[in-house]
């Protein structure tokens, strides 16, 4: 399963072609795997560069990178594309060294080992956002579930359904409200551990957009383990077309529940099909998105959650949060906080829901409901 997700993260086909959403053709579409946008359509016209330069003559560069325990692809277009790709790769590697729980000398591993520590600016920014999301989502996003993820084997690959008493004991120690943060210093409660993996790739892609600005690129796109973020438009001035993997056909990497067209946006998806194991004794499937309130895989009635935002870190954190919260709570959350993001959801009945500002940029062969401030239609 891990290998399949890695392959999907590399599936970037950037030529401009037509596609019927839900079909098996992936031509012209960036695959988003579970991994406000309403103004993106304004960028659909030609860019100043594309008016005067043949798009096929614009220099390009790309790199495939393994970091944060996943495969990543960076593709840049512009005169300084090679420099931008090199700078992006260096930034990815720097943040991987800082944040990876798989590296004993990373900052996060040190904090978990010592129970406290001084945070770098990057870590402090992510922890601050994680605590905000913990508060606004009612605990659906919680960086302190790391010991539970470890207990289930999702951090080691040694999968097992945990003993109920052991799980209950660990669950009692979880809760971001038990963390103490004072300026750049963090202190964990007894038995706690943190993992920023739920927002780290989104934070990273956001940083890459800032790097691309420095190199005055015509356009760029990154896929960090299936988390996609686009810089500006394609070289011909058209929008990037992102195909959201169909959770009802996860084995087929080019089957989409729909296609969303964006510029200068992150498109990040969470789904139960990403990482899971089957218990040999019972035949039951357990996925990796844990409900922080129960310690068990979330059962929210959703199969897939995609968040579209200019803020990669926000999109990353909310894709997980909304999966845990379910349809109704996610819709209400968007109504209260949705100035900076939009949602595309699929429920277990195979019906798709999209927030109103994004509806004009999203196409699907599935039945689509629109989430508005007034309700769901």
Each PLM stretch: what is its role?
Residues 2-377:
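Mature catalytic core of soluble alpha/beta enzymes
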């Amino acid at each position: 399963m891990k290998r399949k997700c890695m392959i999907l993260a590399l599936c970037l086909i950037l030529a401009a072609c037509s596609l019927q959403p839900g079909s098996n053709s992936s031509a012209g579409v960036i695959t988003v795997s579970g991994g406000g946008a309403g103004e993106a359509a304004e960028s659909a016209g030609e860019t100043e560069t594309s008016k005067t330069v043949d798009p096929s003559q614009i220099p390009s560069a790309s790199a495939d990178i393994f970091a944060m325990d996943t495969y990543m692809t960076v593709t840049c277009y512009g005169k300084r594309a090679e420099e931008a790709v090199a700078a992006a790769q260096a930034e990815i590697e720097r943040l991987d060294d800082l944040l990876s729980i798989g590296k004993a000398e990373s900052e996060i591993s040190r904090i978990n080992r010592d129970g406290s520590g001084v945070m770098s600016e990057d870590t402090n920014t992510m922890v601050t956002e994680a605590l905000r999301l913990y508060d606004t989502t009612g605990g659906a996003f919680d960086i302190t579930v790391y010991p539970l993820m470890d207990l289930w084997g999702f951090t080691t690959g040694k999968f097992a359904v945990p003993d109920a008493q052991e799980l209950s004991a660990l669950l009692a120690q979880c809760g971001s409200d038990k963390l103490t943060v004072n300026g750049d210093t963090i202190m964990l409660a007894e038995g706690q551990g943190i993992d920023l993996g739920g927002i780290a790739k989104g934070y990273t892609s956001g940083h890459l957009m800032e790097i691309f600005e420095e190199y005055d690129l015509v356009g760029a796109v990154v896929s960090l383990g299936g988390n996609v973020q686009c810089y500006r438009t394609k070289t011909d001035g058209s929008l990037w077309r992102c195909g959201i993997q169909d959770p009802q056909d996860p084995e087929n990497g080019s089957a989409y529940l729909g296609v969303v067209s964006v510029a200068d946006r992150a498109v990040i998806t969470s789904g139960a099909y990403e990482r899971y194991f089957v218990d040999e004794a019972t035949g039951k499937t357990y996925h990796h998105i844990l409900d922080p309130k129960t310690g068990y895989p979330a059962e929210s009635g959703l199969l897939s959650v995609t968040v579209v935002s200019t803020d990669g870190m926000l999109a990353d954190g909310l894709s997980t949060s909304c999966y845990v919260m379910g349809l109704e709570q996610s819709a209400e959350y968007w109504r209260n906080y949705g100035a900076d993001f939009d949602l595309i959801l699929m429920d277990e009945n195979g019906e798709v829901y999209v927030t109103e500002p994004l509806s004009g940029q999203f196409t699907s062969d599935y039945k689509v409901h629109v989430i508005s401030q007034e309700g769901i239609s």
